[in-house]
Design a protein with these regions (language model features):
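A short, polar/acidic, helix/strand-boundary loop motif
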Residues: 4-37
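RNase H-like nuclease module associated with reverse transcription
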Residues: 25-169
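Gly/Ser/Thr-rich active-site loops/lids in small-molecule metabolic enzymes
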Residues: 1-4, 104-105
Length: 169
């Protein structure tokens, strides 16, 4: 989603740019594992859109510039990763990196933490599952009110939200 301004310039609106729904082709043994992979795959899937938004503001990037942004940071847009899995939020925001019980997830955890340190992810946010609009795209039991709000340009969180903004290297 992208934050913008209404045509009259009086209110902030949200634009849904892309929505992806797919299954993992990996065997997952825990909900933590499924949520961590969803976060990592979501970032991976969103990266081309993020780069496109950056290019719309700064002009077309040369391959060396794109590589430099990935290695050192420097996006002109602010990216917030939102999850409703508190265990994922805690493992990504902890001071010390701890190896997950499912050791195969360590690469995913390390990759997301690296993106946060470089500033490619400005903030990590945890929200209550009841406020998670992405769940409405895939689960039939989720209230459609949030989806309808997003389609009209509004995104509101009715429950407390935790936000972590890491310091850039």
């Amino acid at each position: 989603m992208r934050v913008g301004t209404s045509s009259d310039g009086k209110r902030q609106v949200i634009h849904l740019l892309d929505s992806i729904c797919k299954s993992h082709r990996l065997q997952i043994r825990s909900s933590y594992g499924a949520e961590m992979l969803a976060a990592a795959h979501g970032l991976d899937d969103a990266y081309p859109t993020i780069v496109t938004l950056h290019e719309l503001r700064t002009g077309v990037l040369k391959p060396e510039e794109l590589k430099s942004i990935r290695e050192r940071g420097g996006l002109c847009i602010l990216v917030t990763l939102t999850t409703d899995a508190e265990s994922v939020f805690k493992s990504l925001t902890s001071r010390d990196l701890k190896v997950p019980t499912e050791k195969t997830l360590l690469g995913h955890v390390s990759w997301i933490r690296e993106l946060m340190q470089l500033g490619l992810i400005r903030a990590l946010q945890w929200c209550d599952t009841r406020d998670m609009t992405a769940d409405g795209h895939t689960k039939g039991c989720i209230d459609r009110k949030l989806l309808l709000q997003v389609m009209t340009g509004e995104l509101s969180m009715e429950h407390p939200v935790k936000t972590f903004c890491p310091h850039k290297k």
